[in-house]
């Protein structure tokens, strides 16, 4: 399957087009890791299947269950190959369990996979791969197995091993009649809360009696009357394997939430069930059970992790522990000398005996490192040489394979070695550091292991006590009858009981795994080197370059990195038959300037791993002195640096141009900085380097003369760095006006100037070099010169910035520098006709109306001392508008009409109008100073509830005197639906800011449309501000002046009719309440309710006020606030209380704060629980509104996705909010019918 990827021939050569870049090596999929020192296999977690893994390991380490399953052959269960045949009855679940158990027993891998088994369960979604309850899985899996084994000799497998019965009895105290009921069980469920342990729980369940007396009598069928009685339960039949499920998870009815019981709950390693059984005449050994598995849950009731403690009954695993430091090593009399124990010969023989007398050589070094805590090279290489050489020198003990990849002990020395090892094993392991495992007396102690998905670790029996309590505690217990004895041939024999076809399958799989591991090991130890042949290179421009092409100069060599440098040199000699003389191999690297040699490789006896050569390394093959007759300097000190050198261009006549040119140059890193002047033939000059400390890297710093002898590296220059060269005899913008050199100057950059003078020229755009200190006047003159325009433009032109949308901004004064004008390098400027405004003038944009389209603004230059009135006249004249009914407004930052410029005699400077501002010509004359022009709207709640019956439909008079706004998401009532508001425009009034609210109402009543409403007096009107085309703030005090309301100059007022006058206090909140109609998802018409928030402002206070208003018991109502923008109702409950940790005081929810933000005009839904017990407050209109919002959001999302696809712009992932807890789903296993 791997093709020729793992060829035995390590040295392969290919001519590769190396110039295209290094190849990306695809790493082959590695085979599963072998078993660890315990020699037991774990099970891989598929995401959340730790609950399944723990139960499967328990069943696997139940030998009677495992062997009973193995006893079912293909003639009963069917064949895997026939599972897709329609007529074949293939019992896929038992087959997959057999194969999984065989893999856990025999396959040499760290962890087995349950993917095939879960597929046979029908688990195709991610839901089953999340964590579930292992107790639930235990019952479901047993049920699925029973169904799968119907009609086979194993049909009673679960019944024989796990089935037990309980008998419940009630004994009449009068006639002694016994009424009994028998129950079957596969596991016993016992309580944990308020119980000290398992024996205590069993005593409560099967020993203590429940007595029926007094008010709780029992009706006896024999006596036919209520009598005293006693109820009890007993275990009638005990299964060979007893499963106990602990009720760790309970429900707190006070907090209304689940919780995990973490109190101490003990359980014995051996338990006598005789006191709890109905029959007690049997021998005591019949009732003795031994604990052999504990499934442990770590976490809470909504998540966590399972693992299992398991007793290895058959001693299949290797049960070893680290020796404790506190214990003495051994009796000194029994110890050999430390030097003898520390001899590598003894340690290597011990390792080989542990590894079944065969191990790859490279793994032998790793095992040695693990044993003694130090590598071979550091401890023994100096005295004994390389490890492979040491093995070769002791050929009378060690036998290397033909390719020297593996090593084993010779047969004639293995017996002697084994006796030596047995004599010295204790000393060796006692001398090892604590990390290495030691041997223990594993015969007398029970073998317990902690199996945590893929990981298997040995534990001591006393470690089980740690799982009595806490967040990580026992959840299921498995006991086996102590009389169950295992046959001697099953001890430490994983092949016992496994059918032949599975033995053959596992043997073949192990051979395939070994082959793959060998191939993978070979691939992992093979790397690619790029050989650069010296004769094919020449030294040019400071670095090495191919003479012809990379194809002829570079050879790709695949080589085994476990071989030595001498082997590599010999292989290259054989490949390069034309080579004559010495051959030196050096590490080279491709740098921006070319190829550079860093260091030569020495020590032919070293392996390539020890020389630290990396995969894909560039190796230069040469004589070590010269290339093409040029002596080559090597090392990092003389590494070539590719620098960008900037200097002023020189024209053909020797005149210095203003254009700065950039050219690459290569210099050795250890060369003096001053050599750059020699390279450019500049006799004297100043060198500027880019200052790293400047923000954005836009600053330059001059190198002092005393530092000119420092090297490029000492100056901090590296590949890609830029340096600026200034000739000392130049007099241009790179010098200050005093012609003195400065130690810091700003970076030179460019501006783009476009010809917008409507004059013909050869160039439409030029690039002008400048610094941030360059004057705008100089840039303008340079642009006119380079655009080859008339010199007369110098007196009648200006530069105007162009924004990203192509709009021309206000002209920049000539006297400004680029920094003062806030112009960034790379900006675009337009050369336009007309002078730039002087320092006393303003350049303004203006447009008519508030809906300004981009590009339609007009321009004007005025004196900053001009008045608003005169400025308005100039703008009206320039735009061709007639009349005096106009006023000016300044456009605000969000491109909307701002406050009007009311002080018409004030100057623009006094009103802080600046160049570039936009003024809007708005139709309508401003009211006199101190007066307001207020639009008046009519606010009519739709429907008949509590309003004037003589009102006409507002839409009837729309065409004659008004316009209607319908705010579909406003508060209010509309018959049976919450909240639809119509605002009807009545007209404008002019009123003094000192007038009262009552005077505003009176003046509004003089508007012609008011005559049709028949409002008796201003006291029968309620005033609201208009915000976003619907009622906003309630204006409550009639005698308060309008100025004190701070309404602003753009205020609009809507008036609502009342049946009678009202006097609302400052703490009163006006609410629209609507009672829900049961069963119809609609509401009755709204009624106004005034709630005094000064009495507490809490949910309880409002609930009481609503209950009093509707004459209902407070405990029989539910209320909720309506959010019309979201079409949502938020229930208001007096139980919403928070408890702070410090003071332990209840913190009331004040409804005028979060999350309710209750204010005037809000809609409150009221539910009468006496006749309506539905939890829902929403209406059909809410459903429709939410659906429309969802469709709009979906449309916006699709348009955004389409825009992103067009622009190929990938948005960075936003922070994901915490996901709500997913609903719990039931677990099931799908089984076919075999009846």
From Swiss-Prot:
Residues 1205-1215 have a biased composition (Polar residues). One of its GO terms (biological process) is protein deubiquitination. The keyword Protease applies. The active site is at 50 (nucleophile), 305 (proton acceptor). It catalyses: Thiol-dependent hydrolysis of ester, thioester, amide, peptide and isopeptide bonds formed by the C-terminal Gly of ubiquitin (a 76-residue protein attached to proteins as an intracellular targeting signal). It is an enzyme of class 3 (hydrolase). This is Ubiquitin carboxyl-terminal hydrolase 40. The gene is USP40.
């Amino acid at each position: 399957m791997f093709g020729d990827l793992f060829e035995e021939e390590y040295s392969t050569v290919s001519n590769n087009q190396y110039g295209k870049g290094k190849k990306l090596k695809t790493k082959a999929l590695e085979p599963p890791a072998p078993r660890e020192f315990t020699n037991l296999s774990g099970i891989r977690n598929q995401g959340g299947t730790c609950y399944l893994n723990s139960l499967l390991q328990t069943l696997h380490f139940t030998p009677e269950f495992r062997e009973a399953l193995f006893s079912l052959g293909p003639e009963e269960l069917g064949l895997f190959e026939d599972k897709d045949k329609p007529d074949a009855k293939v019992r896929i679940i038992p087959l997959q369990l057999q194969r999984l158990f065989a893999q856990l027993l025999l396959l040499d891998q760290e962890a087995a996979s349950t993917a095939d088994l879960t597929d046979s369960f029908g688990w195709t979604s991610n839901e089953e791969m999340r964590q579930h309850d292992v107790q639930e899985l235990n019952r479901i899996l047993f049920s699925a197995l029973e169904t799968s084994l119907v009609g086979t000799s194993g049909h009673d497998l679960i019944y024989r091993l796990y089935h037990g019965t309980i008998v419940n009895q009630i004994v009449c105290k009068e006639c002694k009649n016994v009424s009994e009921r028998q129950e079957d069980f596969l596991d016993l469920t016992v309580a944990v809360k308020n119980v000290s342990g398992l024996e205590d729980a069993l005593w409560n369940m099967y020993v203590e009696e429940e007595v029926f007396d007094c008010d709780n009598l029992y009706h006896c069928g024999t006596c036919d009357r209520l009598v005293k009685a006693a109820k009890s339960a007993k275990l009638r039949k005990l299964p060979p394997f007893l499963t106990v499920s602990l009720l760790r998870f309970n429900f707190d009815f006070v907090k209304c939430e689940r919780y995990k019981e973490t109190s101490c709950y003990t359980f014995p390693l051996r338990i006598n069930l005789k006191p709890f059984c109905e029959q007690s005449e049997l021998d005591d050994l019949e009732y003795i059970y031994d604990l052999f598995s504990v499934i442990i849950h770590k976490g809470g009731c909504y998540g966590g992790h399972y693992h299992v403690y398991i007793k290895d009954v058959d001693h299949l695993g290797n049960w070893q522990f680290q020796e404790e430091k506190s214990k003495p090593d051994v009796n000194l009399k029994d110890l050999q000398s430390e030097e003898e124990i520390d001899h590598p010969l003894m340690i290597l023989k011990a390792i080989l005996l542990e590894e079944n007398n065969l191990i790859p050589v490279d793994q032998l070094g790793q095992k040695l490192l693990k044993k003694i805590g130090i590598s071979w090279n550091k401890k023994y290489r100096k005295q004994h040489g390389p490890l492979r050489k040491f093995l070769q020198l002791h050929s009378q003990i060690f036998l290397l394979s033909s390719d020297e990849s593996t090593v084993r002990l010779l047969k004639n020395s293995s017996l002697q070695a084994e006796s030596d090892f047995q004599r010295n094993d204790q000393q060796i392991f006692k001398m090892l550091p604590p990390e290495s495992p030691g041997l223990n007396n594993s015969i007398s102690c029970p073998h317990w292991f902690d199996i945590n998905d893929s990981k298997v670790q040995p534990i001591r029996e006393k470690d089980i006590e740690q799982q009595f309590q806490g967040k990580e505690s026992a959840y299921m217990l498995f006991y086996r009858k102590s009389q169950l004895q295992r046959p001697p041939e099953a001890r430490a024999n994983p092949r016992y009981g496994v059918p032949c076809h599975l033995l053959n399958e596992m043997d073949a799989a192990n051979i395939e795994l070994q082959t793959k591991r060998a191939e993978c090991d070979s691939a992992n130890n093979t790397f690619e080197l790029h050989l650069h042949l010296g004769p094919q290179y020449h030294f040019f421009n400071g670095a090495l370059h191919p003479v012809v092409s990379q194809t002829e100069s570079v050879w790709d060599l695949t080589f085994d990195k476990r071989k030595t440098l001498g082997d590599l040199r010999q292989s290259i000699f054989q490949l390069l038959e034309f080579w004559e003389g010495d051959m030196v191999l050096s590490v080279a690297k491709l740098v921006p300037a070319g190829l550079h040699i860093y260091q030569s490789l020495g020590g032919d006896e070293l392996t390539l791993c020890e020389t630290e050569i990396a995969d894909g390394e560039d190796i230069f093959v040469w004589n070590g002195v010269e290339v093409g007759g040029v002596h080559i300097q090597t090392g990092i000190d003389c590494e070539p640096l590719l620098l960008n050198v900037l200097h002023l261009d020189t024209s053909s006549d020797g005149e210095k141009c203003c254009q700065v040119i950039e050219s690459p140059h290569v210099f050795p890193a250890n060369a003096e900085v001053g050599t750059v002047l020699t390279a450019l033939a500049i006799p004297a000059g100043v060198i500027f380097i880019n200052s790293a400390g400047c923000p954005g890297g836009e600053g330059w710093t001059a190198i002092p003369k005393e530092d000119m002898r420092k090297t490029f590296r000492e100056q901090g220059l590296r590949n890609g760095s830029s340096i600026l060269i200034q000739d000392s005899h130049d007099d241009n913008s790179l010098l200050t006006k005093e012609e003195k050199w400065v130690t810091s100057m700003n970076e030179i950059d460019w501006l783009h100037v476009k010809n917008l003078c409507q004059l013909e020229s050869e160039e439409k755009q030029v690039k002008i070099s400048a610094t941030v200190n360059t004057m705008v006047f100089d840039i303008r003159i340079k642009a006119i010169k380079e655009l080859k325009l008339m010199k007369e433009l110098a007196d009648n032109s200006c530069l105007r910035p162009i924004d990203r949308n192509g709009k021309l901004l206000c002209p920049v004064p000539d006297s400004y520098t680029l920094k003062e004008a806030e112009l960034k390098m790379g900006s675009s400027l337009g050369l336009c006709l007309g002078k730039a405004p002087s320092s006393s003038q303003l350049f303004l944009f203006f447009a008519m109306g508030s809906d300004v389209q981009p590009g339609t603004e007009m321009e004007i230059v005025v004196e900053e001392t001009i008045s608003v009135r005169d400025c308005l006249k100039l703008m009206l004249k320039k735009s061709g508008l007639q009349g005096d009914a106009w006023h000016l407004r300044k456009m605000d930052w969000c491109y909307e009409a701002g406050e009007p410029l009311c002080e018409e005699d004030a100057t623009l400077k006094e009103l802080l109008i600046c160049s570039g501002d936009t003024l809007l010509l708005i139709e309508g004359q401003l009211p006199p100073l101190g007066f307001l022009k207020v639009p008046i709207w009519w606010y009519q709640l739709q429907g008949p509830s509590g309003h004037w019956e003589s009102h006409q439909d507002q839409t009837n008079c729309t065409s004659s005197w008004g316009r209607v706004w319908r705010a579909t998401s406003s508060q209010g009532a509309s018959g049976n639906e919450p909240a639809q508001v119509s605002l009807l425009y009545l007209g404008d009034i002019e009123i003094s800011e000192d007038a009262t609210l009552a005077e505003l109402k009176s003046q509004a009543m003089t508007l012609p449309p008011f005559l049709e409403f028949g409002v008796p007096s201003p006291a029968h009107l309620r005033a609201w501000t208009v915000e976003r085309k619907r009622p906003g703030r309630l204006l409550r005090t009639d005698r308060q002046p309008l100025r004190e309301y701070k309404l602003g100059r753009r205020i609009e007022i809507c008036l609502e009719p009342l049946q009678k006058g009202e006097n609302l206090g400052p703490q009163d909140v006006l609410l629209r309440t609507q009672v829900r109609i049961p069963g119809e998802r609609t509401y009755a018409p709204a009624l106004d309710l005034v709630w005094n928030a000064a009495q507490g402002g809490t949910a309880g206070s409002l609930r009481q006020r609503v209950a009093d208003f509707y004459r209902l018991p407070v405990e029989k109502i539910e209320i909720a606030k309506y959010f019309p923008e979201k079409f949502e109702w938020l229930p208001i409950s007096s139980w919403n209380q928070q408890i702070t940790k410090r003071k332990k005081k209840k913190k009331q929810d004040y409804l005028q704060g979060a999350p309710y933000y209750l204010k005037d005009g809000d809609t409150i839904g009221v539910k009468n629980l006496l006749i309506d017990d539905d939890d829902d407050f929403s209406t059909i209109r809410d459903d429709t509104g939410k659906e429309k919002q969802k469709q709009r959001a979906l449309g916006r999302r699709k348009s955004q996705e389409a825009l992103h696809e067009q622009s190929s712009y990938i948005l960075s992932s936003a922070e994901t909010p915490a996901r709500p807890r997913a609903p719990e789903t039931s677990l099931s296993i799908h089984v076919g019918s075999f009846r």
